[in-house]
UniProtKB/Swiss-Prot annotation:
Required for the insertion and/or proper folding and/or complex formation of integral membrane proteins into the membrane. Involved in integration of membrane proteins that insert both dependently and independently of the Sec translocase complex, as well as at least some lipoproteins. GO terms for cellular component: plasma membrane. Belongs to the OXA1/ALB3/YidC family. Type 2 subfamily. A lipid is attached at residue 24 (N-palmitoyl cysteine). The gene is yidC2. GO terms for molecular function: membrane insertase activity. HAMAP family: YidC_type2. Residues 294-309 have a biased composition (Basic and acidic residues). It comes from Lactococcus lactis subsp. lactis (strain IL1403). This is Membrane protein insertase YidC 2.
Length: 320
C-alpha cells in the first residue's frame, strides 16, 4: 500500500509538472496549428519568458541560417548548461541527505522497530519523538534538502524553453532531417524515452538495495511520462525533451560517479570523528540489539570491506 501511494504521488507530481509547463500559455487551434491565444500573447508569461526565448531560437534558425531544428537544439543546450550548476546544487543537497539517511539506517533501525512495536499511543508518541530527536541530533533534516530556490530559478527557463519549442512562429512548418517539427515524431519520442531511461538507470547504480526498491518506480515512470507527453506534442517539443534528456544524463553521471563517492567519504569521516548520538531514555526496550552495538557492527563491516579493497588495490599497484 505504501509503495502504491509513493508511485501515485510520484506520477501525480510528474504529471502536474508537465501540465504546468504546457499550461502556462493558453492556446487554441488556427488552421490546424495550435498557437497562443491573443490574450496569451499579451500576458506576462509570454512576453517576459516565451517571446525572448522564441527570439533566441529565431537567431539561430533565421539569422544564422541553421534552421529551427538546430535552433531548438542550440538554445536548449545553452540554457540547460547555464542552469546546470543550479541543478547540481539542488541534487547535491538532496542526495547528501539521502546518503546520510542510508548510512544511518542501521543505527535508526532499532528506534523504528520500537515505533512499530509500540502498543499504546503514549509509547508511539514517545518512540516517534525519540526517532525525530535522533535524526535532528545527527543532522538529518529532509526539508533543508529540498532546495526550493534552485528549483524556482530553473522553472522559468523550463517554461520558456518548452513554449518556445512549441509555439515559435515557423517551427510548425519546418522540418529537421525530414522530420516535420509541427507533428508528432515517433523517432524523437523513442530517443527522448531512451535518454530519460538511461538517466534513471544510472541513478540506480549507486543506490542501496532499500533505495532501489523505491527507485525502480522512477526507472519506469520518468521515461514513460516523457514518452506519453512527447507523443502528444509536436516534434519540436520532443526535440526539446531529447536534448534536455542528454543534458540530464550528463548531470546524472556527475552525481553518480563524482558527487556520491565524495559524499560517502565525507559522511564516513563525519561519523568516524563524531559517532551517532542516540538517546534511549524513556523508551520501552523491545529490541535485543542496542543502537550503539548496531552502529559498531555496521561500521566494522564497512571498515573490513575498505581494508580488503585497499589491500587488493595496493597489490595491483605493487605489481605495476
Amino acid at each position: 500500500m505504501k509503495n502504491l501511494k509513493k508511485k501515485l504521488t510520484l506520477t501525480g507530481l510528474m504529471t502536474a509538472g508537465l501540465l504546468f509547463l504546457s499550461g502556462c500559455v493558453q492556446t487554441h487551434v488556427v488552421d490546424g496549428v495550435r498557437v497562443p491565444t491573443e490574450a496569451a500573447t499579451h500576458g506576462i508569461t509570454y512576453n517576459f519568458l516565451v517571446r525572448p526565448m522564441s527570439a533566441f531560437v529565431d537567431l539561430f534558425a533565421n539569422n544564422l541560417h541553421m534552421g529551427y531544428g538546430w535552433g531548438i537544439i542550440f538554445v536548449t543546450l545553452i540554457i540547460r548548461f547555464l542552469i546546470l550548476p543550479l541543478g547540481l546544487n539542488q541534487a547535491y543537497k538532496s542526495t547528501y541527505m539521502q546518503e546520510k539517511m542510508a548510512y544511518l539506517a542501521p543505527v535508526f533501525a532499532p528506534l523504528q522497530e520500537r515505533l512499530k512495536k509500540a502498543q499504546t499511543p503514549e509509547e508511539k508518541m514517545a518512540a516517534q519523538q525519540a526517532l525525530m530527536a535522533a535524526q535532528k541530533d545527527n543532522g538529518i533534516n529532509m526539508l533543508s534538502s529540498i532546495g526550493c530556490l534552485p528549483m524556482l530559478i530553473q522553472w522559468p527557463f523550463f517554461i520558456a524553453l518548452y513554449n518556445a519549442a512549441a509555439y515559435t512562429t515557423g517551427i510548425s512548418s519546418s522540418t529537421f532531417y525530414g522530420i516535420p517539427l509541427g507533428h508528432p515524431s515517433v523517432v524523437l519520442v523513442i530517443i527522448s524515452g531512451v535518454l530519460y531511461f538511461i538517466q534513471t538507470w544510472i541513478s540506480t547504480l549507486s543506490m542501496t538495495p532499500e533505495q532501489k526498491k523505491s527507485g525502480m518506480a522512477m526507472l519506469i515512470m520518468s521515461p514513460a511520462m516523457i514518452v506519453v507527453f512527447s507523443f502528444m506534442s509536436p516534434a519540436g517539443v520532443a526535440l526539446y525533451w531529447a536534448v534536455g534528456g542528454f543534458v540530464i544524463v550528463i548531470q546524472q553521471i556527475i552525481i553518480t560517479f563524482i558527487m556520491k563517492p565524495r559524499m560517502r567519504r565525507r559522511i564516513d569521516e563525519e561519523f568516524t570523528k563524531n559517532p551517532p548520538k542516540i538517546n534511549n531514555e524513556g523508551l520501552k526496550d523491545v529490541t535485543p540489539t542496542s543502537v550503539q552495538e548496531n552502529f559498531k557492527e555496521i561500521t566494522s563491516e564497512r571498515n573490513e570491506k575498505e581494508r580488503k579493497s585497499g589491500g587488493r588495490n595496493a597489490g595491483k599497484q605493487n605489481r605495476k
